Amino acid sequence: MKKEWMALAAVGAILPGAALAATAAEMQALADKSGCFSCHGMQSKLVGPGFAEVAARYKGDSQAAASLAKKIREGGKGAWGRIPMPPHGNLGEDDARKLAEWVLGGG
């Protein structure tokens, strides 16, 4: 009986990690499909800042996810230099929010 409980505990410990990995893969696929990687690298700047830079700049800002989601959908200029970020209005609000949270969480 003790072995069965230990096996269940091990499975329970593994499943949340598997769910997170699937979510990370889904978010990376959404970012790719949405064209994010045309301008942004995970760690480094391409045209726009790398996601790690974005996460570092907004760390501790409780409004960051909402403002970043808005910037994803509506575009922006001046926050990271002279090159504007084009709007992605075809991306739904929910997906924009998920992408923003993913970027802020370190991608």
Q: How should each PLM-predicted stretch be described?
A:
Residues 1-8:
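Bacterial N-terminal signal peptides that target proteins for export
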Residues 8-17:
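Bacterial N-terminal signal peptides
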Residues 16-31, 57-59:
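Electrostatic cytochrome c docking/interface patches
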Residues 34-42, 99:
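The canonical Cys-X-X-Cys-His
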Residues 40, 73, 103-104:
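Protein kinase-like catalytic domain
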Residues 47-58, 73-100:
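Axial heme c-ligation environment in periplasmic c-type cytochrome domains
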